[in-house]
């Protein structure tokens, strides 16, 4: 089935910043549509999104250059291409760009087209996107990692760590896990309200109160879990996204960047010991970016110290790139990869990263970005790849709910064939 038209346009994301939406038209009349997210904290090795830089328009964040690249360069190259040749189409776009970071055409331009192509193919076949991408062996619904307290670059709270998440590991289904998360979210809102703290939400829908520090955030979450009628560890665990690259400089993890004078300054060894101490004290079973993307020795030390009992997720470390993931696997750094489609910039490369991780017995976590749209593609990717885990924000904001609601639909469609969580894959 041939592609007859590709149209790129500028739309707005959940932060009111411009982003890209793409329509791919087929000769049959079917259309695939996709839009592209963007991040607030980014790894230095991520594929580059193309912004206009015109300060007179959207404060320089416009994406008309990337849209033009879609309409004038990518579109002509894809006309009459077979829509089912996803890898070939992505290869054509990568060749047109010709850079390792996709800086010529823009990773946002390439990704928008790549995802829209897959959607168009699924629409033509009249099958769900997760089924088109993953085939017949797709049955794992992901454990949601719900960001309910924001810190770091995602809020103005004086906490260095970027995300405090709950993980409903004790649920029997995605639907139940989502309900558990919602109930804890509302219980936490009451905990914060009763303390006279703000219940305003950040970019990803989590609360951003002026807490005293990391342990205050953890204690507040545990109280909310208890108040909601659940048991820490057995029903719900806690995940952290330290986003350590954001406050790592000259070999030091400088918490004062976000926490002011009360913040500590830690060496790599001290950072490992601090995280190990938190794990021993609280029901934490997942830590993302506990060490900086530039601290590979620190990552090896952390993995050696607690990698046998905690999921250690590489985000900035791996940037969804098989080259960095391969290095991590060889050096024994982390045991899981965070998967962000716009970090690498094409569906093919995203799937390659997940496959490499799973073959090395690394877990994978499919993830949103802080700047999102109503597009729910990552929900389908999580199921398509049997990832078993998804990060798509808190339990508020419609841009986050779009992904959760899509997962509810998928679970309903799979019926009794559905399994819940990444551990289900390893047990089957």
From Swiss-Prot:
<dbReference type="GO" id="GO:0004634">
    <property type="term" value="F:phosphopyruvate hydratase activity"/>
</dbReference>
<dbReference type="InterPro" id="IPR000941">
    <property type="entry name" value="Enolase"/>
</dbReference>
<dbReference type="GO" id="GO:0000287">
    <property type="term" value="F:magnesium ion binding"/>
</dbReference>
<feature type="binding site">
    <location>
        <position position="315"/>
    </location>
    <ligand>
        <name>Mg(2+)</name>
    </ligand>
</feature>
<feature type="binding site">
    <location>
        <position position="241"/>
    </location>
    <ligand>
        <name>Mg(2+)</name>
    </ligand>
</feature>
<dbReference type="GO" id="GO:0006096">
    <property type="term" value="P:glycolytic process"/>
</dbReference>
<keyword id="KW-0460">Magnesium</keyword>
<dbReference type="InterPro" id="IPR036849">
    <property type="entry name" value="Enolase-like_C_sf"/>
</dbReference>
<dbReference type="Pfam" id="PF03952">
    <property type="entry name" value="Enolase_N"/>
</dbReference>
<keyword id="KW-0479">Metal-binding</keyword>
<dbReference type="GO" id="GO:0000015">
    <property type="term" value="C:phosphopyruvate hydratase complex"/>
</dbReference>
<keyword id="KW-0456">Lyase</keyword>
<dbReference type="InterPro" id="IPR020811">
    <property type="entry name" value="Enolase_N"/>
</dbReference>
<feature type="binding site">
    <location>
        <position position="340"/>
    </location>
    <ligand>
        <name>(2R)-2-phosphoglycerate</name>
    </ligand>
</feature>
<protein>
    <recommendedName>
        <fullName>Enolase</fullName>
        <ecNumber>4.2.1.11</ecNumber>
    </recommendedName>
</protein>
<dbReference type="InterPro" id="IPR029017">
    <property type="entry name" value="Enolase-like_N"/>
</dbReference>
<feature type="active site" description="Proton donor">
    <location>
        <position position="204"/>
    </location>
</feature>
<feature type="active site" description="Proton acceptor">
    <location>
        <position position="340"/>
    </location>
</feature>
<feature type="binding site">
    <location>
        <position position="369"/>
    </location>
    <ligand>
        <name>(2R)-2-phosphoglycerate</name>
    </ligand>
</feature>
<comment type="function">
    <text>Catalyzes the reversible conversion of 2-phosphoglycerate (2-PG) into phosphoenolpyruvate (PEP). It is essential for the degradation of carbohydrates via glycolysis.</text>
</comment>
<feature type="binding site">
    <location>
        <position position="162"/>
    </location>
    <ligand>
        <name>(2R)-2-phosphoglycerate</name>
    </ligand>
</feature>
<comment type="similarity">
    <text>Belongs to the enolase family.</text>
</comment>
<dbReference type="InterPro" id="IPR020809">
    <property type="entry name" value="Enolase_CS"/>
</dbReference>
<keyword id="KW-0964">Secreted</keyword>
<feature type="binding site">
    <location>
        <position position="288"/>
    </location>
    <ligand>
        <name>Mg(2+)</name>
    </ligand>
</feature>
<feature type="binding site">
    <location>
        <position position="391"/>
    </location>
    <ligand>
        <name>(2R)-2-phosphoglycerate</name>
    </ligand>
</feature>
<dbReference type="Pfam" id="PF00113">
    <property type="entry name" value="Enolase_C"/>
</dbReference>
<keyword id="KW-0324">Glycolysis</keyword>
<dbReference type="GO" id="GO:0009986">
    <property type="term" value="C:cell surface"/>
</dbReference>
<dbReference type="GO" id="GO:0005576">
    <property type="term" value="C:extracellular region"/>
</dbReference>
<feature type="binding site">
    <location>
        <position position="370"/>
    </location>
    <ligand>
        <name>(2R)-2-phosphoglycerate</name>
    </ligand>
</feature>
<comment type="pathway">
    <text>Carbohydrate degradation; glycolysis; pyruvate from D-glyceraldehyde 3-phosphate: step 4/5.</text>
</comment>
<keyword id="KW-0963">Cytoplasm</keyword>
<dbReference type="InterPro" id="IPR020810">
    <property type="entry name" value="Enolase_C"/>
</dbReference>
């Amino acid at each position: 089935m041939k592609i007859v038209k590709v149209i790129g346009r500028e739309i707005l994301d959940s932060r009111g910043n411009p982003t890209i939406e793409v329509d791919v038209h087929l000769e049959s009349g079917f259309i695939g549509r996709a839009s592209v997210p963007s991040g607030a904290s980014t790894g230095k090795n991520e594929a580059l999104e193309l912004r206009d830089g015109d300060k007179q328009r959207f404060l320089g964040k416009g994406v008309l250059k990337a849209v033009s690249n879609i309409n004038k360069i990518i579109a002509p190259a894809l006309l009459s291409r077979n829509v089912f040749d996803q890898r070939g189409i992505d290869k054509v776009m990568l060749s047109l760009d010709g850079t390792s970071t996709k800086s010529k055409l823009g990773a946002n331009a390439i990704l928008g087209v790549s995802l829209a192509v897959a959607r168009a193919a699924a629409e033509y076949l009249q099958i769900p996107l997760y089924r088109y991408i993953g085939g017949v062996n797709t049955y794992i619904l992901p454990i949601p990692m719900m960001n309910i307290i924001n810190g770091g670059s995602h809020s103005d709270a004086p906490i260095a760590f970027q995300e405090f998440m709950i993980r409903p590991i004790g649920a029997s289904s995605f639907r139940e896990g989502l309900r558990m998360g919602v109930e804890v979210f509302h219980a936490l809102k009451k905990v914060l309200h009763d303390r006279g703290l703000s219940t305003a939400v950040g970019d990803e829908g989590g609360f951003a109160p002026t807490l005293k520090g990391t342990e205050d955030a953890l204690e507040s979450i545990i109280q909310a879990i208890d108040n909601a009628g659940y048991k820490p560890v057995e029903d719900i665990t806690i995940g952290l996204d330290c986003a350590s690259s954001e406050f790592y400089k000259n070999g030091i993890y400088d918490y004062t960047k976000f926490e002011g004078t009360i913040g500590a300054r830690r060496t790599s060894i001290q950072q490992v010991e601090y995280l190990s101490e938190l794990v021993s004290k609280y029901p934490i079973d997942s830590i993302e970016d506990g060490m900086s993307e530039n601290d590979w020795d620190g990552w090896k030390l952390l993995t050696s110290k607690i990698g046998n009992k905690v999921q250690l997720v590489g985000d900035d470390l791996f940037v969804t790139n098989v080259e960095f993931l391969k290095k991590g696997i060889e050096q024994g750094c982390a045991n899981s990869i965070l998967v962000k489609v716009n970090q690498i910039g094409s569906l093919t490369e995203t799937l390659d990263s997940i496959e490499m991780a799973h073959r090395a017995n690394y877990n994978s976590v499919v993830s949103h970005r802080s700047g999102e749209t109503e597009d729910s593609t990552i929900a389908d990717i999580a199921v398509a790849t049997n990832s078993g885990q998804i990060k798509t924000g808190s339990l508020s904001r419609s841009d986050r709910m779009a992904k959760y609601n899509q997962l509810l639909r998928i679970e309903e469609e799979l019926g009794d064939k559905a399994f819940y969580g990444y551990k289900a894959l390893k047990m089957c």
